[in-house]
C-alpha cells in the first residue's frame, strides 16, 4: 500500500483519519480483497473514490488546471452547462477540455484509446483515476484534489 502513486492521497487520508482497509471494505460494501486490488493496481474509478469520501463524511473535488500563461487575460469567463440533477463526476474533466480547447479526438490519440472509450466515460460519467492522471500529463495540466468535511 506504500507504493501507491495514483492513490497516494487516499492512503494519506486513510492514515490521517485512522481508517483501516477493513473499514473501507465495510463502508463500501465490498470484500477486503477488492480494496486490496485497488491498491495493488493503484487505480479505482472516480465514482468509487467520491462514494468512499462521502461515506467517510468528506467531499472530494477534482480539478484540472494549466499554469497561467503570461499572455493570457487575467479574467477568465467560463460558461459551463452542467445538469444539476444529472451526473457530475466528470464535469471537472469536461470543463477542463472545453476551457483549454482540447478536442476529444486529439485526446484519444494522445492517450492511445479509441474515441468510443472517451464517449463511454462521459456517457457513464465515470473513468479510472489513472486516466485522469494520464490526461493531466498529456495536456500539461495539474490535477488538483481538494478534500473537505461535508
Walk through the language-model features, giving the residues of each.
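Short alpha-helical "recognition helix" segments of helix-turn-helix
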Residues: 23-25, 106-108
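DNA major-groove recognition helix of helix-turn-helix/homeodomain DNA-binding modules
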Residues: 47-63, 129-145
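Helix-turn-helix DNA-binding elements, focusing on the entry/boundary residues of the two helices
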Residues: 21, 104, 132
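A short, Lys/Arg-rich alpha-helix, primarily the initiator
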Residues: 1-17, 72-101, 146
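N-terminal flexible/basic segments that precede or flank functional cores
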Residues: 1-3, 42-43, 50-85
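Recognition helix of helix-turn-helix/homeodomain-like DNA-binding domains
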Residues: 29-44, 112-127
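Conserved, charge-rich beta-strand/loop surface module that forms ligand/interface-binding patches
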Residues: 89-105, 114, 120-125
Amino acid at each position: 500500500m506504500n507504493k501507491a502513486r495514483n492513490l497516494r492521497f487516499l492512503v494519506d487520508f486513510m492514515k490521517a483519519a485512522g481508517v483501516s482497509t477493513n473499514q473501507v471494505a465495510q463502508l463500501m460494501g465490498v470484500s477486503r480483497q477488492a480494496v486490496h486490488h485497488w491498491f495493488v493496481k493503484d487505480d479505482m474509478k472516480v465514482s468509487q473514490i467520491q462514494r468512499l469520501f462521502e461515506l467517510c463524511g468528506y467531499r472530494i473535488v477534482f480539478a484540472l488546471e494549466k499554469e497561467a500563461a503570461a499572455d493570457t487575460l487575467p479574467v477568465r469567463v467560463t460558461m459551463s452547462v452542467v445538469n444539476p440533477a444529472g451526473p457530475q463526476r466528470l464535469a471537472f474533466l469536461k470543463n477542463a477540455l472545453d476551457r483549454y480547447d482540447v478536442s476529444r479526438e486529439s485526446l484519444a490519440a494522445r492517450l492511445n484509446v479509441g474515441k468510443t472509450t472517451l464517449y463511454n466515460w462521459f456517457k457513464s460519467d465515470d473513468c479510472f483515476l489513472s486516466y485522469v492522471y494520464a490526461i493531466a500529463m498529456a495536456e500539461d495540466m495539474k490535477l488538483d484534489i481538494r478534500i473537505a468535511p461535508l
